[in-house]
Structures are given as structure tokens and as C-alpha cells.
Amino acid sequence: MKQVRLPSSATVRAACAVAVAALAGCAQIPRDPIIQQPMTAQPPMPMSMQAPGSIYNPGFAGRPLFEDQRPRNIGDILTIMIAENINATKSSGANTNRQGNTDFNVPTAGFLGGLFAKANLSATGANKFAATGGASAANTFNGTITVTVTNVLPNGNLVVSGEKQMLINQGNEFVRFSGVVNPNTISGANSVYSTQVADAKIEYSSKGYINEAETMGWLQRFFLNIAPW
């Protein structure tokens, strides 16, 4: 009976380590969202107050009777008019040219029948370099999203964030927004343009078959990681 020799445990562990490393190279790196703060906030519960018996009783957070309804407290909502149009163009070039020429006579003693009775030496050199480069980018994003006030800064500015999800033909679309809004820029319609929002972060992503079609396959990612070129 022929005895079969099994590989040692060290060999098996090494093979498993190589396989795990290869599979890790094929794995798709998850993309973290650029907006890390909460997408909504709940307003604090108002304190119960005894009715004074007057005609007007202040509502939540003591909002005065003759003030507008612009957001100013945590939990208030605000409409963001997204109107982003960014164009960038860059071009560069370099050109150098250098030439040199040297020519002189060297008197020498005649020998070998006057073969080297007179010698002329000359040297010529040239060096040229030319390079050009350019890059351009254009991004346009238009839409609306309603966000929630998540924090009120000491100077009165509002920290807002929110998201919108849409399920279209088995594809889930996400629109996320966050930033800092100056209450003075809010219009009477309770809206503000994204160009007036400080530290604005706008994210548009999707999950579904279309997004998977735009992703490189695992076997292609494997060869991309191990290929030397």
C-alpha cells in the first residue's frame, strides 16, 4: 500500500495566507461618505408652562408673535437650492533651446609627408526641450433638498444636514447635503442657495445594478493588483 504524504501545517498556513492576500486584493474598497454628521436632529421637548390666561401664549422656544418663520432652532427645516457650476482650466508649457559652435585651427609640426601639417578642430552642440500640458474639469449639479438644523453656533449660524433617498427601477439614489448657513441669507420662502452655504458638502451616490455595472469586476481587480505594468 502506497503511503500518501500530506503537506505540513506550515505549508498549509502559508498557502492560506497567500490565498487570503490574493482575495483581499480582489476585494472592493468601500467608499466612505464625505458627510459624517447626523442627517437629522430632534428638537428638545418644550418645558410645560402654566397658561397665564392671556390672549397670546408663546409657542415652542418662545417664538415671538410678530417674527417670521425662518429656522433658528434645532429641528427646524430649511430648503437648499443646489446650483453648483464649477469650471476649471489649467495649461502650462516650457520651451528651451541651446546651441553652441566652436571652430579653431591648431598648428602642428609636419610629419608623415605633411599629412598633419595643419589641423582644424570644430565642435557643435545643440540641446532642445519642449513640453506642454493642460487639464480641464467641469461639474454641474442642480436640484433642491430640504435639510434639518442640527446645531446652532454661538454666533447664530445654523449647522444643517439632510439626505434624500429615491428608489428608481431597482436603483437607490442618495443625495446628502451639509453645511453652515447664515440666517441673514435665508429668503422669505425659507430657502437659500448652496453657493451661500459655508463648508458645503454635497454627495450624490447610488446603489443598484447601474452602480454595479460601473464597478470593476473582482477578476479584473485581481489582475490589476498583480500586474507589473
UniProtKB/Swiss-Prot annotation:
Q: Name one GO molecular function term.
A: cytoskeletal motor activity
| Family annotation (HAMAP family) | FlgH
Going by the entry's taxonomy, the superkingdom of the source organism is recorded as: Bacteria
Q: Which Pfam families match?
A: FlgH
Keyword Signal among record annotations: yes
Subcellular compartments? Cell outer membrane; Bacterial flagellum basal body
Gene name? flgH
Could you describe the subunit structure of this protein?
The basal body constitutes a major portion of the flagellar organelle and consists of four rings (L,P,S, and M) mounted on a central rod.
Checking InterPro entries in the record gives:
Flag_Lring
Q: Provide the species name.
A: Burkholderia cenocepacia (strain ATCC BAA-245 / DSM 16553 / LMG 16656 / NCTC 13227 / J2315 / CF5610)
For this UniProt record, the keywords arranged alphabetically read as follows: Bacterial flagellum, Cell outer membrane, Lipoprotein, Membrane, Palmitate, Signal
Could you tell me what this protein does?
Answer: Assembles around the rod to form the L-ring and probably protects the motor/basal body from shearing forces during rotation.
One GO cellular component assignment for this chain's record is: bacterial-type flagellum basal body, distal rod, L ring
Tell me yes or no: is Manganese among this UniProt entry's keywords: no
- The protein, known as: Flagellar L-ring protein
